[in-house]
Regions:
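Active-site rim/loop-helix segments in enzyme catalytic domains that contact anionic ligands
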Residues: 1-102
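Metal-dependent de-N-acetylase/amidase catalytic core
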Residues: 1-5, 86-231
Length: 231
């Protein structure tokens, strides 16, 4: 895989959901870019940190990316945490990002309801998944969608695959080795403002990767719904 773009709603989404996959791609030599739509300033439970939460979470995400070996991190501006909607403006911003980065593969959040998981049903997650879907097809590949982007040198681009997480079904598992799992754990532990008990969170992460990998004989895994946009 030449270029992988992860598009997520909040700091920590990439690491909790796909940290092992992102670090594996980076280790194998792919260009890996992570984009975060909000700064997560409505997250956490410490009211004393609220005024600084966005700044703190950006720093946590930078350090988490370092743990994964991801060297390119993009933060969007103007999209408040907890208030993301599938707007025309956000579609345009993601189309511009796709055309700039030119990924073969996008990792993102599912736009579907998943009644088995409270976390997966965060409205920002579903909104980002819906916008990525609309941006990938047809807008990013259509020269007549957002024609002003052509003036910025952002030519149409076809994303070959999108892998969604958090939805009600999966059809693809990425194998993780122990190094991938350890990098994911280190990345998640950088998000100190979000998890009151980091040891408990680490145990949950380790169990989740074991559960995803075990049916396939893997040390660990991460599950996705894989969408091939080429047909």
């Amino acid at each position: 895989m030449d270029t992988v773009l992860g598009i997520y709603a909040h700091p920590d989404d990439a690491d909790v959901d796909a940290g092992g996959t992102l670090t594996r791609f980076a280790r194998e030599g792919a260009r890996v870019v992570v984009a975060v739509v909000t700064d997560g300033d409505a997250g956490g439970s410490d009211q004393d940190l609220h005024q600084r939460m966005g700044e703190l979470r950006r720093g946590e995400q930078r350090r988490a990316c370092e743990q994964l070996g991801v060297t390119e991190l993009v933060f969007f501006d103007g999209y408040p945490d907890g208030m993301v909607t599938p707007s025309h403006a956000l579609v345009r911003d993601i189309v511009a990002l796709i055309r700039r980065v030119k990924p073969n593969l996008i990792l993102t959040l599912s736009p579907e309801y998943n009644w088995s998981s409270i976390y997966a049903n965060h409205p920002d997650h579903r909104a980002v998944g819906a916008v990525v879907t609309d941006a990938v097809y047809p807008a990013a590949r259509n020269p007549f969608a957002f024609p002003e982007l052509l003036d910025e040198g952002l030519d149409p681009h076809v994303v070959e695959e999108v892998w969604f997480q958090g939805g009600p079904s999966t059809n693809h598992v990425v194998e993780l080795d122990q190094a991938d799992i350890e990098a994911k754990v280190r990345a998640v532990r950088e998000h100190v403002t979000q998890f009151d008990d980091l040891d408990r969170m680490e145990s949950w992460i380790r169990q989740g990767t074991r559960d995803a990998g075990k049916p396939h004989g893997y040390a660990g895994g991460e599950e996705f719904f894989r969408w091939d946009t080429r047909g």
